[in-house]
C-alpha cells in the first residue's frame, strides 16, 4: 500500500519524516557507531554494563537506543550485548593450545556475571555448551594436523 498526502502519492515516505534536532544522526548510524565502540573498547566485557551506560556514551536516551537496536538487529539490548560476549568466548576457546580455560574465568573475561548465565546464553546461541564447543574445535584442529 502506498501512503497518500493531499492527493500526492509518496513513493519514499522518509522524505517527509522530520529529523529530530536532539538526534541528528539516524538510529542506524548511532547503533553502527556503537557497534564499533563495543568492539574497539570492549564494553561488553563489563559485567555491569547497562543500556544507560551506553546512552551516556552516545548522548541518547534509553528508549531511543533500545528501539534503534531492536529496529536494526531485531533483538533487545541484553541479547545484542550477549552476541559480543559469546563471540569473545569463542575466540578465547579457539586460541587455547589444548588446555581448556576454567569456565568461571572464561565467563568473567567475557563479561558474564556467572558460569550459569554464561553456559545458558552460550548454549542458546551455539546449540552446544562451551565445553562441547571446545571439544569440537580440538577435534577439528587434530583432524587438520593429520592431513
Feature map (PLM): residue ranges:
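Generic hydrophobic, amphipathic alpha-helix propensity
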Residues: 30-33, 82-86
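Alpha-helical bundle regulatory/interaction domains
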Residues: 1-37, 51, 58-62, 76, ...
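DNA-recognition element of transcription regulators
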Residues: 51, 65, 82
Amino acid at each position: 500500500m502506498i501512503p497518500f498526502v493531499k492527493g500526492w502519492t509518496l513513493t519514499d515516505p522518509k522524505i517527509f519524516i522530520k529529523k529530530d534536532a536532539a538526534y541528528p544522526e539516524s538510529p542506524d548510524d548511532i547503533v553502527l557507531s556503537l557497534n564499533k565502540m563495543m568492539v574497539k573498547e570492549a564494553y561488553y566485557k563489563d559485567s555491569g554494563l547497562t543500556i544507560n551506560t551506553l546512552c551516556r556514551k552516545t548522548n541518547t536516551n534509553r528508549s531511543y537506543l533500545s528501539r534503534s537496536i531492536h529496529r536494526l538487529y531485531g533483538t533487545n539490548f541484553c541479547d545484542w550485548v550477549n552476541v559480543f560476549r559469546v563471540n569473545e568466548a569463542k575466540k578465547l576457546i579457539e586460541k587455547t593450545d589444548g588446555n581448556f580455560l576454567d569456565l568461571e574465568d572464561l565467563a568473567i573475561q567475557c563479561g558474564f556475571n556467572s558460569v550459569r548465565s554464561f553456559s545458558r546464553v552460550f548454549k542458546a546461541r551455539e546449540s552446544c555448551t562451551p565445553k562441547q564447543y571446545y571439544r569440537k574445535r580440538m577435534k577439528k584442529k587434530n583432524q587438520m594436523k593429520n592431513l
